[in-house]
Amino acid sequence: MYILFISIAIMIILSFLMLSGFKSPSNYIKIGEKAPLFELFDQDEKIFSLKDYNGKKMVIYFFPKAFTPGWTKQACGFRDQYSIYQENNIEIIGISYDLREKQKSFSEKNKLNFRVLSDSKKEVSKLYGVDTYFFPKRVTFLIDENGIVFDVIDDMSLSDYAKNIIQIFKKHNIESNENIEK
């Protein structure tokens, strides 16, 4: 009976992974690569184009769904730290499969001060290697002012997430400056 239970559990887990389009970190855009350019509509039905942000540091984070507890915590953390991001010339972009209407509702309810993009066709999620069948994986790409991905985060606790991201940017900036001086 125990073996039957374990076998069924393993089959269910494997089926879920296959159906969800499970992606491993090896599928993500690699550190050191140029961030793929894309265009998507934001919550206000305005087109966001990554090429318009050339020369800016970027946080591009993919999240599963609007109104989920995890994303609410993550988004509100970015909202609360937004002025620090702006002082450091860093733009924040959130992306999910949700439709614009849902993104707009979520943004208004939580008073978000950054753009949230709708990738309902899953095209950008595929470009960045975070696509799954049901929703994109929770992954954050940190991009320098040259458009190069310098960090990929998929395992950080959501507590103080936005503050920790700022520290990663500051550390990268110090390391980049040291490399220039050498």
Q: What kind of feature is each model-predicted range?
A:
Residues 35-36, 57, 137-139:
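Short loop/turn microsegments at loop-to-beta-strand junctions
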Residues 62-80, 84:
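Conserved redox-active cysteine motifs that mediate thiol-disulfide chemistry
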Residues 51, 128, 152-153:
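Short hydrophobic alpha-helix segments
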Residues 56-58, 63-67, 99:
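Short pre-active-site segment immediately N-terminal to redox-active cysteine/selenocysteine motifs
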Residues 38-58:
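A short beta-strand-turn-helix
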Residues 1-41, 175, 182:
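N-terminal targeting signals for export/organelle localization
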Residues 91-93, 104-138:
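Short, internal strand/loop/helix patches
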Residues 137-182:
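Thiol-/selenol-based redox modules, centered on thioredoxin-like
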